[in-house]
Amino acid sequence: MSRAKRIALALLLVAVGAYGQNARIPADAVDAFHAALKNKDTAAALSLLDRGLVVFEFGVVDPTVEAYALAHLPLDIDIAATTQWKLESRRVGGDGSDRWVISSYRVTGTQSDGTPIDQTMLETAIVRRSGDRFRIVHLHWSTNDPTYQTSLKRSGAPKAR
């Protein structure tokens, strides 16, 4: 990664605390994250992610918030901008500072190449209380749609490390 990219990312990560959102209950952090993606608001999305974030996304691992911010966050923003995510079911659990939010969504719309999307997306989010707000420490997305899986491989998405 270039020095300029590292500096820009560091400045963005330092600034994200200002956005903090109003994620006072676990599901608020997840919903605010999805809204930030849909609105193409990188700073707001990052403000909802804990510094210890690990993302599992369709067989690919982003082991740090920095790796996610550089590799997959831009792709997730692009997809969110052209799709609609309808919440179908949700369960929330855990206690103390660590909670989990398990959701299924019906995702419809188009990919950036115009390919239609109509699938069920499964999401597991683990959130942790940070002061009076919750931040996401782990995300795991999956779908059993083989066409979508194939399109991700063709798009040049980074492979699992």
Per-segment meaning from a language model:
Residues 12-52, 154-161:
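Short, low-complexity N-terminal intrinsically disordered segments enriched in polar/charged residues
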Residues 79-80, 107-118, 145:
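Short, cysteine-centered beta-strand-loop-beta hairpins and adjacent loop/turn segments enriched
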Residues 52-53, 60-62, 107-109, 142-146:
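Solvent-exposed loop/turn segments at secondary-structure junctions
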Residues 42-95, 118:
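A solvent-exposed, acidic/Ser-Thr-rich amphipathic alpha-helical stretch
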Residues 1-8:
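Bacterial N-terminal signal peptides that target proteins for export
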Residues 120-150:
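Short beta-strand edge/turn micro-motifs at domain boundaries
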Residues 92-99, 114-115, 127-135:
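A short, structured loop/turn motif at beta-sheet edges
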Residues 97-107:
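A short hydrophobic beta-strand element
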